[in-house]
């Protein structure tokens, strides 16, 4: 076999493996109740206390395990995040089920992608206090919205939030309906992915799925 042919086979095989990699799905059923889930790291953008991310039995259920951010610190500019330790993604589809339980300052839940550190990443979030979904970038710890859509986000109800990132193009679905379609070039390189809340938002998360390309 010619050297360049062998090289092409290696490259094609690698590309094929990346393209057909199975999605990562975390349903928290194998994690210990009362402890942080394995495979995540935790951080906080802004002030106030660190987030408290623990696995609990779903409120009102007998046995379904969920990830809960349960710290109710009232600091307004406070954004607890939980990101997967492994994996770095540029083009990716993220999906999560989330249920806002409480929050006087806010009731926001979101998805994070192209995460560099606690002060630099993209986020899309839906808010049961404001009844809207928004895309932001957080740069050097400062959050800026670049697209917003008003939609009902009932408290104590499960919702499905989905985000697809392809290059500089981001599409967001809320409960099966496309609500946001935006472009931004702030972060072009791959980064980590994860979950987000704000202020005193107490949120349950389940079935976090990461489908990279």
Question: What role is predicted for each listed range?
Answer:
Residues 139-160:
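Short, aromatic/His-centered strand-loop micro-motif at the edge of beta-sheets
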